[in-house]
Every structure is written in C-alpha cells, then in structure tokens.
From Swiss-Prot:
It comes from Bacteroides thetaiotaomicron (strain ATCC 29148 / DSM 2079 / JCM 5827 / CCUG 10774 / NCTC 10582 / VPI-5482 / E50). InterPro entries: SmpB (IPR023620), SsrA-bd_prot (IPR000037), SsrA-bd_prot_CS (IPR020081). Required for rescue of stalled ribosomes mediated by trans-translation. Binds to transfer-messenger RNA (tmRNA), required for stable association of tmRNA with ribosomes. tmRNA and SmpB together mimic tRNA shape, replacing the anticodon stem-loop with SmpB. tmRNA is encoded by the ssrA gene; the 2 termini fold to resemble tRNA(Ala) and it encodes a 'tag peptide', a short internal open reading frame. During trans-translation Ala-aminoacylated tmRNA acts like a tRNA, entering the A-site of stalled ribosomes, displacing the stalled mRNA. Coiled coil: none annotated. SUPFAM superfamilies: Small protein B (SmpB). Keywords: Cytoplasm, RNA-binding. Its main location: cytoplasm. This is SsrA-binding protein.
Amino acid sequence: MKQPSVNIKNKRATFDYELMDTYTAGIVLTGTEIKSIRLGKASLVDTFCYFAKGELWVKNMHIAEYFYGSYNNHTARRDRKLLLNKKELEKIQRGMKDPGFTTVPVRLFINEKGLAKLVVALAKGKKQYDKRESIKEKDDRRDMARMFKR
C-alpha cells in the first residue's frame, strides 16, 4: 500500500535566506510524532537548528499532538535531534562559524521507506534590498508568464 506523500516546506527560508548547501537528515521522533507527520500536521515556521555537544538539533518545530494518542502523547514544540554523518556535521559546524551563516530547515518529507527526513540548508541571511529584489523578480516572471499565455 502506497502512503500519501508528505511535503512540508518552510517558505520563509527561501525568502529570508540565501541557501548555500543542503543536507538531508533523519529525525529522532516518538510514535505519535511520526503519525502526526504522516497526516501532514507539522509546521516549520520559526524553526532553526543549533549545535549542542557536537550534535545538531532542531528547535521550535511544531508537530501537532496526535488525535488518537492517549496519555503518552508528545509535546508539540520540543527540541528534536537530527541524524547526520560525522563529516556532514563537521561541514555544517565549520560553515556556521562564518559570520552571517546559520542552518535552517527547508523541507520535511517522508521517504520511500516511510522515514521522516528533514532537509536543512546552510544559509546566509538576506538584506532588505535583496528581499525587495527577489520580490521584483517574481513579479516580473509572473508578468512574463501572463503575456505568453495570451
């Protein structure tokens, strides 16, 4: 039986940051958390990553409580550990030491094996004029698409 595809995106990440390198990481979850994600009840708004004791953690990721979960339901916003190779962790940590760089979650999905994966990106914050420029480019692309439709 094929599971419905779950693809939850952090739309603010591409607007607020210039994404450099992306990495696909596993997430340490409880049973009710993965069930909620499979139902699409998760959000990456205001989510960020940080290092603690050489491990990468995601903070402020909202996974709604599972409706059918009883007393052993999870906390909606808790810190979750990300699973990456040692080399990838070292690359991300080196990149975050540069001024202006951070690590942001971009996309949450379920792979073909049924495991939840989080795509994190090493990113540099955009300035206000860069954001205006990207809005203008999007508007220009929309206008061109409208003109070609006619």
